[in-house]
From Swiss-Prot:
UniProt name for this protein: Nucleoside diphosphate kinase 1
EC annotation from Swiss-Prot or TrEMBL: 2.7.4.6
Post-translational modification, as annotated: The N-terminus is blocked.
Organism for this UniProt entry: Spinacia oleracea
NCBIfam families documented for this protein: PRK00668.1
Amino acid sequence: MEQTFIMIKPDGVQRGLVGEIISRFEKKGFSLKALKFVNVDRPFAEKHYADLSAKPFFNGLVEYIVSGPVVAMVWEGKGVVATGRKLIGATNPLASEPGTIRGDFAIDIGRNVIHGSDAVDSATKEIALWFPDGVVHWQSSLHSWIYE
């Protein structure tokens, strides 16, 4: 089954959106496989966002991520990467549809509440970076009510 990496960014944590965001993924039918609440240091943030290091907004993005604690998670389910991105909404919250996490809870692109893997290969890399000891292997008793 496919897995994705989701991070609730410092603004989402500070604004008390952790429960709401987790609830949306659970209600969709995805399974939480790993979760940690952590303060990210600059070298780790730079490693996570290494693919964006040449962008003019890179330093601001890193400063934003290290400004407070984040909630790092791994979710599992059929099509979880693409569907997770749909639940999250567009990178720019002003372009996000109402009903998405960013559409409902964010305004500025620089404070967009949440990160989600953009592809299966990105998810694999991000999960390995954030959870080097692996994730919890379990199956919800609701699995057969969600999947054929």
